[in-house]
Amino acid sequence: MSEPAENCSPRWKDEAIQNGYIPSYLDKDELCVVCGDKATGYHYRCITCEGCKGFFRRTIQKNLNPTYACKYEGKCVIDKVTRNQCQECRFKKCIAVGMATDLVLDDSKRLAKRKLIEENRERRRKEELQKTVWDRLEPTQEEWDLIRMVTEAHMATNAQGNHWKQKRKFLSAAGVKEDKPEEIGQASMANTPEGNKVDIEAFSQFTKIITPAITRVVDFAKKLPMFCELPCEDQIILLKGCCMEIMSLRAAVRYDPESETLTLNGEMAVTRGQLKNGGLGVVSDAIFDLGVSLSSFNLDDSEVALLQAVILLSSDRPGLSSVERIEPCQEEFLLAFEHYINYRKHKLAHFWPKLLMKVTDLRMIGACHASRFLHMKVECPTELFPPLFLEVFED
């Protein structure tokens, strides 16, 4: 077997090194219009070789043409042999064939152009990298199964499904007035300080739907195997912690900009004022603000379901004994959630972090409601509170 030759390289590479790079728009045998050497492309509006391109650029950038002087009265023939013998005639021929002095950039413009090219190159690199990231982060088969499971759990426990607009009834139809408490009539108002007044009639309407709303949250949780595998005590803590947050989320995603109402439990459409007067006070503002904000997100059922699962499996609820089991469950949903968002809405900048911030908003609503609940117990007759409502929200 013969030994390989030293410095061997493919023939095409040797030819490329010898001939130089030729753009695809040039014929293979195209010649420089200044000196007749092999052309390498359009330079300053003419087809030239690299040598004449560089000569012309240096002449303009350094303003050298006044220093050029021909020894033969400006009548030199310029070709690839004589081009370096007379700079004046070479420059005159550059001008004569049409090379444009205005296309030669000075140092500052050249640096700016180079910077722009580098920035564009870096931008394209990042776009390609981002595209690769999005492509790579499509949910795995296991994550798709998790998404399908939690979506089915949500839809099975979500009152009226996607037909809530057709099925809803406005609270005003039940004879409950709205907005200013003083317009509702003092007879129906609990005797409490201004700003904390509760419309007893509205509150009694809300209590009719609160038990089925809570029951649906519990049913949703019980459809998640990882939740059911937790100790009973931890299940209770998680449900008590997330119940108001999930009910608020379910109401917020049913905000209707046209009527400026939220639909509670898929059936009762209420205004901001009615919800406030019905017992929630300032908490109603937070829920409505969340609804207004979420209306621009156009969340689908899977996104709402995943958001609920993340809220349910919050391992920082006080009193939990199985934090080390709950944390991985929440992480599993978070990762599937992120991949699902990246897969579906990768063209929307910062969509995932903005959506994740809504978890913080919902936690704030839950905390505010816990404080508000103490006032409601003072303001409203005890017999109006459904047993399940008290069981969930009392410490």
Swiss-Prot record:
Entry binding sites for Zn(2+) 1: C32, C35, C49, C52
InterPro entries: NHR-like_dom_sf, Nucl_hrmn_rcpt_lig-bd, Nuclear_hormone_rcpt_NR1, Nuclear_hrmn_rcpt, ThyrH_rcpt, Znf_hrmn_rcpt, Znf_NHR/GATA
Residues annotated to bind L-thyroxine: R216, N265, H369
GO cellular component assignments: RNA polymerase II transcription regulator complex
Major site of localization recorded for this protein: nucleus
Zinc finger (NR C4-type): 32-52, 70-94
Domain NR LBD: from-to ranges: 142-395
Role summary: Nuclear hormone receptor that can act as a repressor or activator of transcription. High affinity receptor for thyroid hormones, including triiodothyronine and thyroxine.
Name used for this protein in its record: Thyroid hormone receptor beta
Protein encoded by which gene: thrb
